[in-house]
Amino acid sequence: MDHVVVAGAGISGLAACLVLSHVAARMTLVERLERPSEVGAALALQANGMVVLDRLGLLRTVQAAGVRIERMNIRNVSSRTLLTATVPDFGAGLDHAVAVRRTDLHTILLAAVAGRHCVRTRFGCTVVGADPTGTVTIRCSSGGQETLSADLVVGADGVSSAIRETGGFNSRVSAGHSYARTVVQSDVTPWLEEYWTRLGSFGHAPLGHGLAYFWVAAQAPPAADAVARRDLPALIDVWNRTLPAAAGLLTKVSSFDDLLINTVRRVDCRHWFSGRLVLIGDAAHAMAPNLGQGANGALVDAVVLAEQLVSGVTAEEAVQRYDRIRRPAVRRVQDVAGVLQSLCALGSPLAHVRDAALAVSTLVPQLGQNASRRALLPDVRAVRSAMVFDHTSC
């Protein structure tokens, strides 16, 4: 394949560049920001995302930047354990998750892309139109508008994807819950801890060096009102009356400006391709964060797409095969994440029914681990066996 254009220099776009550099002779990476950066606080890399980084030769670097996570607990508002899950062991360094700052992961991926001589970066350029024939129109901050032609255009430009919105995709975007997230100076448990309350979820994970990542739901009216007023003391008070542990971390936030506030959106597309245009990551399948599969799924998308492109079929057939393989599987993940997002915010008496049902899993701890293993195993196997990495990168 001669030329591939990737729109978006976030985690999914950078990963796509790295993987597709084993397929394309030359690539163009388009990003609207003049200095690309990753929006967000932190994430947990799971086995399916980590195996992609391993195949790219970046896993050890990422592991060194993050913290090893071996289990997660879910508790109710009374701190009663609802579910404990040990991270499943897939061998070869994939027996844990890694909590890492998004900026650190982004920096590592960006440096790796800079080492690919065939990738031309067009930072400060906004996609204003895309056509299924493989043409993309961009407008750059330096002035002027131009059209790029490619054998394949990859839309990795997030939930508000310009490729998706202008490229003839039949899609639906629906709003979900809102969250406040940040990183603070604090010591927390060495595992991922999440609480389910009537306000929604609160959770935290260690990042090392005395830092912790945490999030609080901001969807329920008392919290939403405080966020709308940008009133940090009021948000602390709301959570203190519900879950003092959450308020304890919120008090370590210096100002409201240190919080990242976002409303999670779900993206559903009838297909992830339109001619020579194809979507990956949030552009294709943004979802609730409750399974932590956003970035992990995007990494797998890139490999599955590239694997079809090296199979000897046309670009059009390759993206259709990618769609048939990935879209149904990811739809199931989206659905489960959405259900969990609703379950975690139940109030009485439904919360008591939920807690009683989940209590069964605490009697058989392997249930949570086995479910996680079954969910991730197909991705891990697909990436490990991918032949695209046998091709020399450009």
Q: For each of these PLM feature ranges, what is it?
A:
Residues A226-D258, A315, D323-R324, P365:
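Flavin-binding catalytic cores
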Residues D2, A64, L291, E307-C394:
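C-terminal helical "tail/cap" subdomain of flavin- and related membrane-associated enzymes
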Residues S12, R35, S160:
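Conserved Rossmann-like nucleotide-cofactor binding loop
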Residues M1-V4, S21, Q46-G167, R172-Q185, ...:
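Conserved N-terminal helical subregion
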Residues V5-H22, V30, G155, D258-A345:
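Conserved mid-domain beta->alpha element of the FAD-binding
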